[in-house]
Amino acid sequence: MALYQRWRCLRLQGLQACRLHTAVVSTPPRWLAERLGLFEELWAAQVKRLASMAQKEPRTIKISLPGGQKIDAVAWNTTPYQLARQISSTLADTAVAAQVNGEPYDLERPLETDSDLRFLTFDSPEGKAVFWHSSTHVLGAAAEQFLGAVLCRGPSTEYGFYHDFFLGKERTIRGSELPVLERICQELTAAARPFRRLEASRDQLRQLFKDNPFKLHLIEEKVTGPTATVYGCGTLVDLCQGPHLRHTGQIGGLKLLSNSSSLWRSSGAPETLQRVSGISFPTTELLRVWEAWREEAELRDHRRIGKEQELFFFHELSPGSCFFLPRGTRVYNALVAFIRAEYAHRGFSEVKTPTLFSTKLWEQSGHWEHYQEDMFAVQPPGSDRPPSSQSDDSTRHITDTLALKPMNCPAHCLMFAHRPRSWRELPLRLADFGALHRAEASGGLGGLTRLRCFQQDDAHIFCTTDQLEAEIQSCLDFLRSVYAVLGFSFRLALSTRPSGFLGDPCLWDQAEQVLKQALKEFGEPWDLNSGDGAFYGPKIDVHLHDALGRPHQCGTIQLDFQLPLRFDLQYKGQAGALERPVLIHRAVLGSVERLLGVLAESCGGKWPLWLSPFQVVVIPVGSEQEEYAKEAQQSLRAAGLVSDLDADSGLTLSRRIRRAQLAHYNFQFVVGQKEQSKRTVNIRTRDNRRLGEWDLPEAVQRLVELQNTRVPNAEEIF
């Protein structure tokens, strides 16, 4: 009876008019009733079992809180939520989940042993992940009940959540249905349904999801132990690791954003799924703030700016690759020139390496084993024929499978190893802007942020262990200098040895200590991500923040102990013995294309002068001044500045000035009869600040100075 009451109370007026699958069904389908009935039966047994354990083992446990405070609790009885209420009512209201001994934990799940306890709120990345994961369960419940959906997967993402579900071979969800589905989700949150965590055996899981082939596949593929967890919430029962919110009422504001299709791939033919994406917050006020932020972000979308300013475009005949138009190429080249100038005085040597390599190289480096699916491999013509015995090594056809390089490091190792090296050559800093190719899935492509073909400001430093700390400090200084010019703040994180690391633990300890010391001396705040390093070495991740406060991981500093071993890299030390160098992977911009997109959004298309594809427009007052205007334009171009001419006689002077401001030209040189006679220009900025009359050569020289110093506010300090 409880199920039928829940089903009825969740039905909304108007659903039948929207023609949603089960809107006219007054009772739940048989499979749902059976699934929920089995869940309730297993839940009752679990509650009884836990109560029995708490009675049999009534023991006190010690709970350690951040800051050193310790609290007594009762094993199998006390929950993190109860402790939060003891500490503060505000904490109890704002906590979304807990961390117990570093692992995510439900607030209503009893503690079992002595533990370190930390509470997660929505303000933390971990808290947001829990909050949005719970929200996708709400979306799944709504889709299941009112669309007749067969649920597939519903993760949280960096900026919200989505749920994939199956509606049949022909059925898709229409955009017009999203508002109704959103309203259903809001009703489910208002009902404040609790999330209940259940441990079930593999056989029980198969019974619970016997009518859902997607969940059955996940059970066989992902569940490796004797049990796994499912969560119940209202009429929803879903396979899930958790944790979740205490109840759906903690979701104060929820909005569905988009619908699209996705693919489910298993051993059979791919199934087309429907994907609905959304966002949620603890309060409606936070949702309103986010909506205003999103409106601003859409105005700053780099794809929109790229189209309006004619910087770049994409074409279906080259998916995942960008076509940079002349103005976009100007910005691109200015960024690369900036890094090249830094390389020149920081002791880096730029090199060029091939794009195609035999897969033997990638097997030697280890990338073929771990990265093969993300690489483009090609079979050269005639590769099925053995090379002629008459040909020598220089003309023999290579019969190996070839692959486009997704990174430069193995090529730089070949470059280091191609001749004997001495300690006097170290540190050897090799920089490479070569094109990289990665086989990104078509669904993951998006503007400049994820491409199949791109360039990086990629460099590798080969040094001795004694030089390591100084090189790391130099890399950090490089980052700070570049990001300061670009106007980005940033946050550093040290990722240390993971469980599956390779190499000598003592070497890892030594390297991690060097990185910690370098970060300490660098003076910027940093976080420690224990166990989050790559298997081949610890790393420093760099998260920059744009004008909208969004984080972007672009730069990196990565130590590598494995490639020098795999390529047997050696140099002759001061004592004459052969020694192994340390390898540092480092990038500041990361993908140049991606960083250009981040910059476009951060400045909203108002480029700083040194990067701007719209530096100066010369505007003659009348046709009589057009020749002098062309002369002024030529002077600007001869000085290496981007200059355009607007002599459109069909528009008034004020209309042309306004057009230049809307196009975000940094400066406008207006020339009339007086300016022509005196060989001067009248200067305005894009914000309509009037700088007055300047001699043409002096104005050009001042712009060159401002461009060369890469100031962010040339219009203000002209």
From Swiss-Prot:
Keyword Aminoacyl-tRNA synthetase: yes
Keyword field: Aminoacyl-tRNA synthetase, ATP-binding, Disease variant, Ligase, Mitochondrion, Nucleotide-binding, Phosphoprotein, Primary mitochondrial disease, Protein biosynthesis, Transit peptide
GO cellular component: mitochondrial matrix; mitochondrion
Modified residues (Phosphoserine): 52
Matches recorded under Pfam families: HGTP_anticodon, TGS, tRNA-synt_2b, tRNA_SAD
Entry EC no(s): 6.1.1.3
Domain TGS, chain residue ranges per copy: 55-121
Alphabetized HAMAP family for the sequence: Thr_tRNA_synth (MF_00184)
Protein purpose: Catalyzes the attachment of threonine to tRNA(Thr) in a two-step reaction: threonine is first activated by ATP to form Thr-AMP and then transferred to the acceptor end of tRNA(Thr). Also edits incorrectly charged tRNA(Thr) via its editing domain.
Complex and partners: Homodimer.
Listed name of the protein: Threonine--tRNA ligase, mitochondrial
Biological source species: Homo sapiens
